[in-house]
């Protein structure tokens, strides 16, 4: 599900920024843009072998948006830009994965504390539900929580970590009356188990 919907549109925006930068600066890459995208991808557990699938959904979205303007020449040019950026991201993401205390992309975490703070916000604290080694986290990093949606599909939602004790992960979830995922997270109780992608540093707030 992370490869459909808003994900291709968000990535398309980053690729446009990347393309503009390399046109203006032919001998360098936009490190800040690449870092931001790489950390988001790593927080979702995206791996090198998934980039062709990302390409498929991305270019389907581009073709739908451009219509007849998506000529073979334009598609070829943007494909080249995609793989220039993609290969740079793959290198960065490999470094992020190598810095972790484990080699898994996600593991089970249980809710150990739940506090309602008003204004439809609940603060959830998680601890590992198994013995998977954890890298120490800090407030402000990315985290992705994976829960089953009402239709049975599993979906990931990114949040920014709050400060917490060692081996804990804490997030604040604001209820969106029109959003399915926030209502599911609001219904979690102490003892419930979810899957969590391993934490990566962030460089900007998660929207």
Regions found by a protein language model. Give the residues of each.
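Acidic-glycine-rich active-site phosphate/pyrophosphate-binding loop
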Residues: 28-34, 189-197
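Globin-like tetrapyrrole-binding proteins
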Residues: 1-106
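Ferredoxin-reductase
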Residues: 103-193
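A short, basic/flexible loop-to-alpha-helix module at the beginning of a structural domain
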Residues: 199-207
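Surface-exposed loop/turn and secondary-structure junction residues enriched for glycine/proline
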Residues: 6, 14, 47-49, 72, ...
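Short acidic/polar capping segments at secondary-structure boundaries
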Residues: 83, 116-117, 200-201
């Amino acid at each position: 599900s992370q490869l459909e919907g808003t994900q291709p549109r968000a990535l398309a925006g980053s690729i446009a920024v990347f393309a503009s930068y390399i046109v203006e600066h032919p001998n360098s890459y936009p490190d800040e843009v690449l870092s931001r995208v790489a950390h988001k991808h790593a927080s979702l557990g995206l791996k090198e072998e998934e980039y062709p699938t990302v390409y498929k959904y991305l270019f389907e979205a581009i073709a739908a948006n451009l219509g007849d303007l998506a000529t073979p020449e334009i598609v070829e040019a943007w494909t080249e830009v995609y793989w220039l950026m993609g290969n740079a991201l793959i290198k960065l993401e490999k470094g992020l994965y190598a810095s972790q205390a484990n080699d898994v992309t996600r593991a089970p975490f249980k809710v150990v504390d739940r506090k309602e703070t008003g204004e439809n916000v609940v603060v959830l604290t998680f601890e590992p539900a198994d013995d998977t080694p954890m890298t120490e986290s800090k407030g402000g990093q990315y985290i992705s929580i994976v829960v089953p949606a009402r239709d049975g599909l599993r979906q990931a939602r990114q949040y920014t970590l709050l400060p917490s004790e060692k081996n804990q992960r804490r997030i604040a979830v604001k209820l969106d009356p029109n959003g399915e995922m926030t209502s599911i997270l609001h219904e979690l109780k102490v003892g419930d188990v979810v899957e969590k992608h391993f934490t990566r540093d962030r460089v900007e707030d998660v929207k």
